[in-house]
Amino acid sequence: MGRPLLNRRLAAFGTTIFAEMSALAVRTGSINLGQGFPDSDGPEEVREAAVRALRDGRGNQYPPGPGIPELRTAVAEHQQRWYGLSYDPDREVLVTAGATEAIAASLLALLEPGDEVIALEPYYDSYAACIAMAGGTRVPVTLRPDTTGPHPAFRLDLDELRAAVTDRTRLILLNTPHNPTGTVLTREELAAVAELAAERDLLVVTDEVYEHLVFGTAHTPLASFPGMRERTVTIGSAGKTFSFTGWKVGWVTGSPALVSAVRSAKQFLTYVSSGPFQYAVAEALRLPDSYFHSLREDLLAKRELLAAGLAEAGFAVFRPSGTYFITTDIRPLGETDGFAFCRALPERCGVVAIPNAVFYDHQDQGAPFVRFAFCKRESVLEEAATRLKGLKVS
């Protein structure tokens, strides 16, 4: 055949780095701190709720297209409980097959070919693919490493964000807490985004799946700012908050017009999914505050454990304000190429990580940065830290 089989919009996207590195972990028997999935299940009562639904025959056949009423109501209650945001479960909440489908459906629904999408770089790799599938053009605004203060972090340059907007800009794709850097945008930064969106009549799709994984600060939804509820699609997920990533239950909240548009695209993707698990997630969202507090405290302890181990091994460490990922700089180890470093790491010390360069349009900007996940058991993190000590430059 003379014509390439793969659609030209996807030609630049091969096998994801997560598949490559996870396969490498299996082949070498390494500790996988690359892909962000926990190595233990979430709350027992939530798992049992799924079992009950299966046994009772609830959700074993096609659930309603927008999601079961119980889950849509629970999502609306969650947004009111934590953020004071009021959503109509029937018109302003849509259940999706995880957050990734929510992102894809939102972009497919809201973009015309040639529309520009501003995204904070580095970004979750599916953003670029979803923008491409929708025929959009991605415009990165790069979070820059700042090591001048006592707490190194990646920061947003608001002037750069404003300069990225053109007459072709349709929407901003926002992620806070941010994967992979762990940055949590401040109220001042979010207010500036809201002001810019209103001034230039932009939509915002905001990926907030790490909303409950924040340390020493509070998550603030963009939709809570004046005028933003009507122009913001907010995406949430059960996988990160409840440690059931395999269930693939996500959701969208927004105005009736926005949710209706996203549903129009979503219905031709999976249409429905995760029937019995939807009942379980509805119960999970109503867990007491103590669960969410314990989740943060547990992850904070794990963050400190792994961060200390990485620092001792010789990495420069960016302690995240949110998510369960730590970005490191490998240059103090005498390394500059994150790809080569991560591909060699399993053989060198039996640990798998992800090169941040895959999250950049211009990969040289992310070349020295490597991401580690700390959503693992403490014993696993301790063993990983021990193995990594062998890397330190003497």
PLM-predicted stretches and their roles:
Residues 28, 134, 199-200, 313, ...:
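Helix C-cap/helix->beta junction micro-motif
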